[in-house]
């Protein structure tokens, strides 16, 4: 008995066990866990149990209990207790309370098994206290072990039969399970199979269920007790216990119809003996059943049988035809025995004709099909055709009439057609439907097929910071569908901490992580029964980047000062400090936070606002500082007629550079003095010193401009617009709103009055974020990685590029995911952790001190794929003088790129140059390399190719010499050809014999030493086998065939025997040897043509001259003489005999020429005056035992024939040892033919076997030798 598979370590130190309680009582299950504080769940039939009046759940420390109150039959299911990953299943069995008055059986005869009883008539009601079979509860399906149905306890009366059935699920089993039946603890019942015990098994291919049965025949009191059924597979084991109760047969004074059956046997002195029961265990019953008494009293027997069944005399007789019609064929003989049927074969023939006459429907012209199938959500029409167009039709669902309700069901009547339309089919519509017209019904079954759940909107990759909320969202094709979430291949469940939350909203499915951690990074998968979607989650530590810092400002009184900075996280808040103290906003001081930009605005600047200002992001160790300087303009007293002067640090000798960020406002205040008030002119000068713009309509050189400008010349800049000049008495203001790159350059300011002029050059530099780089290029694509390359942007924004930021997204997604937080300094990056087979795109950002550029165009879509692994099992299959045959198996890992083919190369020994062996790629896993040079030593290798490139090479380690290998010829004879091949006339013979040998051997066939005729027998040869083909076998094809292989001087020969058989001819010389009383003795001789096969027996039939209907008297009868008894007085009978061999019965029969007349009884019989002849004789073997040589492992029989009066007792010996108690041997005796069957003999079973026959007149014995050969 195989040991059960070892289980993983359980969280339970004490497990609940299967318990049996009485109905109405209380059941308690207890469990103990290894640790305290573990949450324990209880389940009933897969559904979690909650605390209620019915179920009480308690937990104290590590002890847990489940109490079920008022146990009923509905509670007899499978329960389970779960702690962590451990799950223990157990059962609750409910037994009915014992009854005070047991129901006595109705019949005195032994009660057969419930499965063997024929269906009784509808009106019978033998025992009102026993519920009918239809109301019995169904056997519970076993969800724990291997059993689908366990054997149940049984009860039988002495002499009755009972069958125990066990069903095992075979869907997950690779081969048939092993089943053993035991009585008590250790008694294996396989060794007890015989007259009273039979074991059966079968396999249902449709339901994939193995059925094993143990049948107990003619039970006696010693059979009662406990039994066990054990089933085991390679890695699983289960067992089930059941009990058998055997009741004594009740005493009844009524007539037992079986007492009318008598077996007649010959006793010494020629007297005929009748006995109700002559057989004993181990011996065959002798004589023949006498049904003559029943012929005259059939009606009385039927009434007696009815009384035996507990019926009243007023009830009608049993309809034996109805019982036979409903009963299975295996019950026919039992019914015939029970109800006194004498001509069972005749009744069965008539019953067969009755069954063929199917009753035609009068109400329906066309019925419903047996079954229909429809997809969920679709509609279906069920249609019938009725004979009467005015007939009323009812439609039933699961036995309940369907009522009109909305648009769900539509009833239509079109002529003779009646149509039921079911709209929007759901799983609730999967049921049995009936159409009822008057008293006739038409049945069908509707199966609603649920389509697979598809993922219509897949998951998207996400990148978050530690502590942020993560929400994965996908959309499926069905509302409320069940999906499974996994992280890195491990299923996610609702934990006690509720780390993961699952949410459904219509067709949308959500996975929510409230507070993400670094450990949450990974690949998340959502699975349905029709699709899979994968997304990646990257959780980064919080890191703040400053895209734009605050700058120092110099402003005048009553001007506006604006400090602005930009950080990477728009959710980060911060505070502003002035000389270390927090700035409090008021009407003049404003603080704003819009997105990633933080601003501090000071209106109407005063000298008190001059200070150091700082911005501190909340939660980060950053301090952004800048200084605000207050410019106080002091104008000294200038006498009248003073030349103009520009009060700047730069007086035109060296350019002063003013830097402004693109998009910001540039305000340049230039203090001036002079009397009279000078005229201000602004000009923009290019790098060569030429005037870009001028104040007059004519072009002026710088020298001309400086000397010839007048006060009434046209000004370059307007007082309104994006670029403008504001004039004041003591200063002028140059303003650029939203500085742009084109505003960069040298600006010249000229002040002039009649007294003189002054000028100054101011350099304005506009800095900006870089231009977006060009689209990145993808290279070096692997299984989950790739290399990204890009070029610097064409314009860096006037500031050096600090680094780059890379983003990635799936082709079908809209969400870009950032791959790096630290700026990339290099122009290449290796992206990892991608999913093979998914299409991605990349884009790049350039970052300088001002900020981040716009994204680059997306790269070309690409798919991470990897080359396959190298092919496996690369070997040389065959070598010839110019060819080498190679074979291999596909790579273990192919990947999402598939497999385009293989490339095969070879290299000469000592060389490093590999030469392609085949033109292009081959898709096969074998190759024949041709046109090689004989004698070369070559290395071979093979590579697998797909979109990603070549795999590693599988190389043959040793060089292969191109030269034919001589191999001795050897014929491999199939097992079924090692013994005589028997075929019937007309069948096709196709014999294939494989062989080995190189070079290709010469093949020759012979029959009985003569060459085969090619016109009659076909021969086809190949390099590995030879085939003998006969399209239509005839008797002359029988014989010994020899096939010979020859390679030079080496040969191998095998002989095959073919036997063609045909039906035998009829027996010869049949005659009536004697007619006496109600008996006729027949004799005949064997047929002249035995059909080339041994005659197995004869079939004897009789026919009354009046009806000439033939009835079989004997089947498989071996002797050439017989006595037909129990003939009817006054009738004339003809007799015929068929011969039988392996092909079947002969086409014609030998028939007696003259009828045998059974004379009527006359005067009283006067015994003869002479002494009666003594018919007794000592045993004598009429057919000897034959020496045999058999193959081990196949059942073998030894047969002989004996005669003797009285019937001798038979003993079998092996090497003088009695075999009576050995279960390996089975002994049979039928009509004088003795057979010893040896089950699967081994070489140890060889030896001398002796058969000994003993009776009161003497004894005889015969011996043979048995050799057991081991198959080669």
From Swiss-Prot:
Residues 102-117 have a biased composition (Low complexity). The modification Phosphothreonine is found at residue 274. Pfam families: fn3, I-set, THB. GO terms for cellular component: M band; myosin filament. SMART domains: FN3, IG, IGc2. Residues 772-868, 870-965, 1066-1161 form the Fibronectin type-III domain. Residues 137-252, 359-451, 452-542, 543-640, 644-763, 969-1057, 1179-1263 form the Ig-like C2-type domain. The keyword Phosphoprotein applies. PROSITE patterns: FN3 (PS50853), IG_LIKE (PS50835). Residues 95-147 are annotated as: Disordered. GO terms for molecular function: actin binding; ATPase activator activity; myosin heavy chain binding. Belongs to the immunoglobulin superfamily. MyBP family. Thick filament-associated protein located in the crossbridge region of vertebrate striated muscle A bands. In vitro it binds MHC, F-actin and native thin filaments, and modifies the activity of actin-activated myosin ATPase. It may modulate muscle contraction or may play a more structural role. May be involved in the early phase of myofibrillogenesis. This is Myosin-binding protein C, cardiac-type. It comes from Gallus gallus (Chicken). The gene is MYBPC3.
């Amino acid at each position: 008995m195989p040991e059960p598979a070892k289980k993983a370590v359980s969280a339970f130190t004490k497990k609940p066990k299967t318990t049996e309680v009485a109905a109405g009582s209380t059941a308690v299950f207890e469990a103990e866990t290894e640790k305290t504080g573990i949450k324990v769940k209880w389940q009933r039939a897969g559904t979690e149990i909650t605390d209620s009046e019915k179920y009480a759940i308690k937990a104290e420390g590590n002890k847990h209990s489940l109490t079920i109150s008022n146990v009923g039959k509905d509670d007899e299911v499978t329960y389970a207790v779960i702690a962590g990953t451990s799950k223990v299943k157990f059962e609750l069995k409910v037994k009915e309370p014992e009854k005070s008055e047991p129901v006595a059986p109705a019949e005195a005869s032994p009660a057969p098994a419930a499965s063997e009883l024929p269906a009784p008539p509808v009106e019978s009601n033998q025992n009102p206290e026993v519920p009918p079979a239809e109301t019995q509860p169904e056997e519970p399906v076993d969800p724990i072990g291997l059993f689908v149905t366990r054997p149940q306890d049984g009860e039988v009366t002495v002499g009755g039969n009972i069958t125990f059935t066990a069903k095992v699920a075979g869907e997950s089993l690779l081969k048939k399970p092993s089943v053993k039946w035991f009585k008590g603890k250790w008694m294996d019942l396989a060794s007890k199979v015989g007259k009273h015990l039979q074991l059966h098994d079968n396999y249902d291919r449709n339901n994939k269920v193995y059925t094993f049965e143990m049948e107990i025949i003619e039970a006696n009191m010693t059979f009662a007790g406990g039994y066990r059924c054990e089933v085991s597979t390679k890695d699983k084991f289960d067992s089930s216990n059941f009990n058998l109760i055997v009741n004594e047969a009740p005493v009844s004074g009524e007539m037992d119809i079986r007492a009318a059956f008598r077996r007649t046997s010959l006793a010494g002195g020629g007297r005929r003996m009748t006995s109700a029961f002559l057989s004993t265990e181990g011996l065959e019953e002798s004589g023949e059943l006498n049904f003559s008494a029943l012929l005259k009293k059939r009606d009385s027997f039927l009434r007696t049988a009815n009384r035996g069944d507990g019926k009243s005399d007023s009830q009608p007789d049993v309809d034996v035809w109805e019982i036979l019609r409903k009963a299975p064929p295996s019950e026919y003989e039992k019914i015939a025995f029970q109800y006194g049927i004498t001509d069972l074969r005749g009744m069965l023939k008539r019953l067969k004709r009755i069954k063929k006459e199917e009753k035609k429907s009068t109400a329906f012209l066309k019925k419903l099909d047996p079954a229909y199938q429809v997809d969920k959500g679709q509609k279906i029409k069920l249609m019938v055709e009725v004979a009467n167009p005015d007939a009323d039709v009812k439609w039933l669902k699961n036995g309940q009439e369907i009522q009109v309700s909305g648009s769900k069901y539509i009833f239509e009547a079109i002529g003779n057609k009646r149509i039921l339309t079911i709209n929007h089919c759901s799983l609730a519509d999967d049921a049995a439907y009936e159409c009822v017209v008057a008293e006739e019904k038409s049945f069908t079954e509707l199966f609603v097929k649920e389509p697979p759940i598809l993922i219509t909107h897949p998951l998207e990759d996400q990148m978050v910071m530690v502590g942020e909320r993560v929400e994965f969202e996908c959309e499926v094709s069905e509302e409320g569908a069940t999906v499974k979430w996994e992280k890195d291949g491990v299923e996610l469940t609702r934990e006690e901490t509720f780390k993961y939350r699952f949410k459904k909203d219509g067709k949308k499915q959500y996975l929510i992580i409230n507070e993400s951690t670094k450990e949450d990074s990974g690949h998340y998968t959502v699975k349905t029964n029709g699709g899979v979607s994968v997304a990646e989650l990257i959780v980064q530590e919080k890191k703040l980047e400053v895209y734009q810092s605050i700058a120092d400002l110099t402003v005048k009184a009553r001007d506006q000062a604006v400090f602005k900075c930009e950080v990477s996280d728009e959710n980060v808040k911060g505070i502003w400090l002035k000389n270390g103290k927090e700035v409090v906003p008021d009407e003049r001081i404003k603080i704003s936070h819009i997105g990633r930009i933080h601003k501090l605005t000071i209106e109407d600047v005063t000298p008190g606002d001059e200070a150091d200002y700082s911005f501190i992001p909340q939660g980060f160790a950053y301090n952004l500082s800048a200084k605000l300087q207050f410019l106080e303009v002091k104008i000294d007293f200038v006498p009248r007629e003073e030349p103009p002067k520009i009060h700047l640090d730069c007086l035109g000798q060296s350019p002063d550079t003013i830097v402004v960020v693109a998009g910001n406002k540039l305000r340049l205040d230039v203090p001036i003095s002079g009397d009279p008030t000078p005229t201000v002119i602004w000009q923009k000068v290019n790098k060569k010193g030429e005037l870009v713009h001028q104040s007059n309509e004519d072009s002026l050189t710088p020298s001309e401009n400086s000397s010839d400008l007048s006060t009434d010349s046209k000004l370059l800049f307007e007082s309104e617009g994006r670029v403008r000049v504001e004039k004041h008495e003591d200063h002028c203001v140059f303003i650029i709103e939203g500085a742009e790159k084109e505003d960069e350059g040298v600006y010249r300011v000229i002040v002039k009055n009649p007294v003189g002029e002054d000028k100054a050059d101011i350099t304005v530099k506009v800095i900006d974020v870089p231009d977006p780089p060009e689209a990145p290029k993808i290279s070096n694509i692997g299984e989950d990685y790739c290399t990204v390359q890009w070029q610097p942007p064409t314009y860096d924004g006037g500031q050096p590029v600090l680094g780059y930021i890379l983003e990635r997204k799936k082709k079908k997604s809209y969400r870009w995911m950032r791959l790096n937080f630290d700026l990339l300094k290099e122009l290449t990056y290796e992206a990892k952790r991608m999913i093979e087979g998914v299409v991605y795109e990349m884009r790049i950002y350039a970052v300088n001190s001002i900020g981040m550029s716009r994204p680059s165009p997306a790269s070309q879509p690409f798919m991470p794929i990897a080359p396959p692994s190298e092919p496996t099992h690369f070997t040389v299959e065959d070598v010839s003088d110019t060819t080498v045959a190679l074979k291999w198996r596909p790579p273990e890992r192919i990947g999402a790129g598939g497999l385009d083919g293989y490339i095969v190369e070879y290299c000469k020994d000592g060389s490093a140059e590999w030469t392609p062996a085949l033109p292009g790629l081959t898709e096969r896993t074998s190759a024949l390399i041709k046109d090689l040079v004989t004698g070369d030593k070559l290395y071979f290798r093979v590579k697998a190719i797909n979109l990603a490139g070549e795999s590693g090479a599988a190389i043959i380690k040793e060089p292969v010499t191109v030269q034919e290998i001589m191999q001795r010829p050897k014929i491999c004879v199939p097992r079924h050809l090692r013994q005589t091949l028997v075929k019937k006339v007309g069948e096709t013979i196709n014999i294939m014999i494989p062989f080995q040998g190189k070079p290709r051997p010469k093949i020759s066939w012979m029959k009985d030493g003569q060459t085969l005729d090619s016109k009659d027998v076909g021969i086809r040869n190949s390099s590995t086998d030879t085939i003998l083909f006969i399209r239509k076998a005839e008797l002359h094809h029988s014989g010994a065939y020899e096939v010979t292989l020859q390679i030079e001087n080496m040969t191998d020969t095998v002989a095959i025997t073919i036997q063609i058989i045909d039906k035998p001819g009829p027996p010869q010389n049949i005659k009536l040897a004697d007619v006496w009383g109600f008996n006729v003795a027949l004799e005949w001789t064997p047929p002249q043509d035995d059909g080339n096969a041994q005659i197995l027996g004869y079939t004897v039939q009789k026919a009354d001259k009046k009806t000439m209907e033939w009835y079989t008297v004997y089947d498989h009868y071996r002797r050439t003489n017989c006595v037909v008894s129990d003939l009817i007085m006054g009738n004339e009978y003809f007799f015929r005999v068929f011969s039988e061999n392996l092909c079947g019965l002969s086409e014609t029969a030998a028939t007696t020429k003259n009828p045998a007349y059974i004379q009527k009884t006359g005067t009283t019989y006067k015994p003869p005056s002479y002494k009666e002849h003594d018919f007794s004789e000592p045993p004598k073997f009429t057919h000897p035992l034959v020496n045999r040589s058999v193959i081990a492992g196949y059942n073998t029989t030894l047969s002989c024939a004996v005669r003797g009066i009285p019937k001798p007792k038979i003993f079998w010996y092996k090497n003088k040892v009695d075999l009576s108690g050995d279960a390996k041997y089975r002994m049979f005796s039928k009509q004088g033919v003795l057979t010893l069957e040896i089950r699967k003999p081994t070489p140890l079973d060889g030896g001398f076997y002796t058969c000994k026959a003993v009776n009161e007149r003497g004894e005889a014995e015969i011996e043979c030798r048995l050799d057991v050969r081991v198959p080669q």
